[in-house]
Amino acid sequence: MILFPAIDLKDGQCVRLKHGDMATATIYNDDPAAQAKAFEDQGFEWLHVVDLNGAFKGQSVNSAAVGAILKATKNPVQLGGGIRTLAQIEDWLDRGLARVILGTVAVRDPDLVRQACKAFPGKVAVGIDAKGGKVAVEGWAEASSLGVVELARKFEGAGVAAIIYTDIDRDGVLTGINWDATIDLAEAVSIPVIASGGLASIADIVRMTMPDAQKLEGAISGRALYDGRIDPAEALAILQGRPEAKS
């Protein structure tokens, strides 16, 4: 079970939003590369990065910041936000990304996702962001008519490395992960699922260790880490089943 610390990039800075609304951005670090290294030093083994400007614009915007992150950390990095073409995917993977996350294009052009999975095995994840059970696109600014499981099932057997499932209503507001919807998705498909949106406390970390959550690959944490609501050492000890984990 992996805990992915999150770096969301807006105008070259590390920020957190509430419900995906750019107007609610709180700046946590103006040096994303330093933040990436700090997460590595705390013991995390992966890094989740989102180009927020890119998600809204439909093309990579914070490329310089992502490049600096890749140089600063030895941890594998997954990136989403504004990645729409095979050429972009190839470019980012050549620059050192461990995997790319395709969101809007997974709805608009699912065949491109399948092509990407064939071209770059194990390097392509799908981001499914939902509000009220329906998939949202274009930086969460537009709603679609697609259901979460309906979209996920389109990629069964395609070679998708993981599905990152975000409940927009819970994102950035520390209300706890939508465990019911997340576990329902994990049980509906064979693709590994990563939970995102709302992780709030050590209680959520403990919840990740429960038997019904074992189909998950992990969860993403942003604001709870930045605000100190989750202690990295304690969280990682719990997930790794180490004796020093607190009950």
Curated annotation (Swiss-Prot):
Keywords: Amino-acid biosynthesis, Cytoplasm, Histidine biosynthesis, Isomerase. It is found in: Cytoplasm. It comes from the Bacteria. One of its GO terms (molecular function) is 1-(5-phosphoribosyl)-5-[(5-phosphoribosylamino)methylideneamino]imidazole-4-carboxamide isomerase activity. The active site is at D8 (proton acceptor), D129 (proton donor). The keyword Cytoplasm applies. Pathway: Amino-acid biosynthesis; L-histidine biosynthesis; L-histidine from 5-phospho-alpha-D-ribose 1-diphosphate: step 4/9. CDD domains: HisA (cd04732). InterPro entries: Aldolase_TIM, His_biosynth, HisA_bact_arch, Isoase_HisA-like, Isoase_HisA-like_bact, RibuloseP-bd_barrel. Its main location: cytoplasm. The keyword DNA-binding does not apply. HAMAP family: HisA (MF_01014). Belongs to the HisA/HisF family. This is 1-(5-phosphoribosyl)-5-[(5-phosphoribosylamino)methylideneamino] imidazole-4-carboxamide isomerase. It comes from Mesorhizobium japonicum (strain LMG 29417 / CECT 9101 / MAFF 303099) (Mesorhizobium loti (strain MAFF 303099)). The lineage of its organism: Bacteria, Pseudomonadati, Pseudomonadota, Alphaproteobacteria, Hyphomicrobiales.
